[in-house]
């Protein structure tokens, strides 16, 4: 569907995943959550989705994600929000079964045609990964928000956790960074059409194909890059035995991102993410804010053996996925994340 400027971002305080609460603050209030033997996923490291075993051969994968508008077109907002929510299941190496819509609708500023187009965009993305939208729930809200509750399935022994990287692995990122910067420029009405088109293409792309390709190479860990930024999600992938060495010169950014960054068009979420990550890399400064930029529908982080990394990269590139090797897993260092 053609992009329409329906002024969705004008009526919200923060756009997309930049509206998330600070990761540091959340960590202090979620320590009451309990685990049972059937819950296979780890609740202590902000896993992308829950994995709950219901039989010897089947586990349910469940996640929920909703965001405020990051673009001004209702159809594209719905598609992006859906891609963002579905990504958590793909990051677990699982298959999506169905999804439920979650809608907070601002009836004061939007008519029901906005809602119709939004739901159509989401439905098209869910169909793209051979799944179904089976219902949902809508409330009136002072700000528009939309997302999905997604259910998937996986064999209990075959899901991919986010904190099981092995020393020597390479880390592949499957999408360029910078959607937080570009969406901030859009909200400020300073984003040009070329960069808007680039941002839309990036965020609407599902991580479905990338996940399917990665699984052929038996990755040791996977996650996706969303609201906590590249460094925040790498932090969640750490374990007691490893650190990450990031190759700064290899980091991919969407066209125009550095230009808008230098103009000071930086989302508040980037500063929150920087504070969250400083305990691991104390010498981190505001020059590295780009690495903390909150992403919406960002790429996968795939931890894969060095011997398989180049072949995996080629398979991704053959599917027009803009993947890059951006880091290596090393023995535990004084700083858990090293930028070289």
UniProtKB/Swiss-Prot annotation:
It catalyses: hydrogenselenide + ATP + H2O = selenophosphate + AMP + phosphate + 2 H(+). Belongs to the selenophosphate synthase 1 family. Class I subfamily. Its cofactor is Mg(2+). The record marks 20 as: Important for catalytic activity. This is Selenide, water dikinase. Keywords: ATP-binding, Kinase, Magnesium, Metal-binding, Nucleotide-binding, Selenium, Selenocysteine, Transferase. Gene3D superfamilies: PurM-like C-terminal domain, PurM-like, N-terminal domain.
């Amino acid at each position: 569907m053609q992009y329409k400027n329906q002024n969705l971002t004008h009526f919200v305080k923060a756009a997309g995943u930049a509206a998330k609460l600070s990761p540091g603050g959340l960590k202090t209030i979620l320590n009451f959550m309990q685990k049972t033997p059937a819950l296979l996923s780890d609740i202590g490291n902000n896993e992308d989705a829950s994995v709950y075993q219901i039989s010897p051969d089947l586990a349910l994968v469940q996640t929920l994600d909703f965001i405020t508008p990051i673009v001004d077109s209702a159809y594209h907002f719905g598609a992006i929000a859906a891609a963002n929510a579905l990504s958590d299941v793909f990051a677990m190496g699982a298959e999506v079964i169905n999804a439920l819509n979650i809608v907070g609708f601002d009836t004061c500023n939007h008519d029901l045609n906005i809602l119709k187009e939004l739901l159509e965009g989401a439905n098209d993305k869910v169909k793209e990964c051979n799944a179904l939208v089976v219902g949902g729930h809508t409330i009136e809200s002072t700000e528009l928000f939309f997302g999905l509750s997604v259910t998937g399935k996986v064999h209990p022994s075959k899901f991919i956790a986010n904190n099981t990287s092995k020393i020597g692995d390479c880390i592949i990122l499957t999408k360029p960074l910078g959607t937080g910067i570009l969406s901030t420029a859009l909200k400020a009405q300073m984003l040009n059409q070329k960069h808007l088109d680039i941002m839309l293409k990036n965020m609407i792309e599902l991580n479905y194909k990338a996940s399917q390709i990665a699984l052929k190479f038996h990755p040791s860990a996977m996650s996706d890059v969303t609201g906590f930024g590249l460094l925040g999600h790498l932090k969640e992938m750490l374990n007691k035995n490893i650190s990450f060495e990031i190759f700064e010169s290899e980091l991919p950014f969407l066209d125009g991102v550095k230009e808008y960054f230098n103009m000071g068009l930086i989302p508040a979420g980037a500063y929150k993410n920087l504070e969250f990550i400083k305990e691991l890399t104390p010498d981190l400064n505001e020059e590295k804010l780009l690495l903390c930029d909150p992403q919406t529908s960002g790429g996968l982080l795939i931890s894969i053996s060095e011997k398989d990394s180049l072949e995996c990269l080629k398979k991704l590139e053959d599917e027009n996925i803009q993947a890059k090797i951006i880091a290596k897993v090393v023995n535990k260092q004084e700083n858990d994340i090293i930028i070289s």
